[in-house]
Amino acid sequence: METGNQTHAQEFLLLGFSATSEIQFILFGLFLSMYLVTFTGNLLIILAICSDSHLHTPMYFFLSNLSFADLCFTSTTVPKMLLNILTQNKFITYAGCLSQIFFFTSFGCLDNLLLTVMAYDRFVAVCHPLHYTVIMNPQLCGLLVLGSWCISVMGSLLETLTVLRLSFCTEMEIPHFFCDLLEVLKLACSDTFINNVVIYFATGVLGVISFTGIFFSYYKIVFSILRISSAGRKHKAFSTCGSHLSVVTLFYGTGFGVYLSSAATPSSRTSLVASVMYTMVTPMLNPFIYSLRNTDMKRALGRLLSRATFFNGDITAGLS
């Protein structure tokens, strides 16, 4: 790349959704509503699982971690975007940009790995039901989640640290609403070969592990279900995996959509819309997917809300 006019970045300009003030106001209301729904939905899932002993099982343990990852994944970018729209100040500091890259990559990778772990959990539940509690013991569940966290943090840290070696040109505009790593690399004047190698290697390894794990799990699940003679047992087995399969399809479908939109057209607006689907819509829908058709989860949420209402009533009565 060109080496002239290099500088150490102090701040970047997030162009985001360039629109009139009226449209910006509408976007602020829309994104704030989506964020509040996402935050509340995932927080309720976590609280319901923690407060209900009936949900202290491997499946719900992984689900609570997924909800936490989704909550943090969205919180990494959306609050800053809302602040930028509200104040009309679209600048982000260099340190803030690196922080966004690190946490966005960490929680995105964690989402990916947790979905793979949950696919393995469903495989054991359907294909080895009699040995489920022995195989999916608390020690293994803890190690799977801890391993997912470690891989996510280490991979993200490596990608973020490679950005520190870069010098940037005078053009500091990012055509996005957050510090997307690939967009930041495009602004660098110094050589980004090492950065690209790290990104594509990490993405490739993670993609192969996740795709292989999920594909193998559901390959075995489908063949196990087809061998079941009872229609009722078949339906129960399918319903056990339905929510997870829906979330997997939504997660990878929107992620693949972001990639295709970036590769097919240079339009930043198309990429922005695809990124909103990936960073906001998917985490917002996950709590609904896991709770609407899950009787145990709906009961736990009902008990949680009942206790909250009762507690609020006691406080109100005490103050009056």
From Swiss-Prot:
Keyword annotations of the record: Cell membrane, Disulfide bond, G-protein coupled receptor, Glycoprotein, Membrane, Olfaction, Receptor, Sensory transduction, Transducer, Transmembrane, Transmembrane helix
Family: Belongs to the G-protein coupled receptor 1 family.
Membrane topology: Multi-pass membrane protein
Annotated organism of origin: Homo sapiens
UniProt superkingdom: Eukaryota
Gene Ontology terms describing biological process: signal transduction; spermatogenesis
MF annotations from Gene Ontology: G protein-coupled receptor activity; olfactory receptor activity
Name of the protein in question: Olfactory receptor 7C1
Subcellular location: Cell membrane
The keyword Membrane appears for this protein: yes
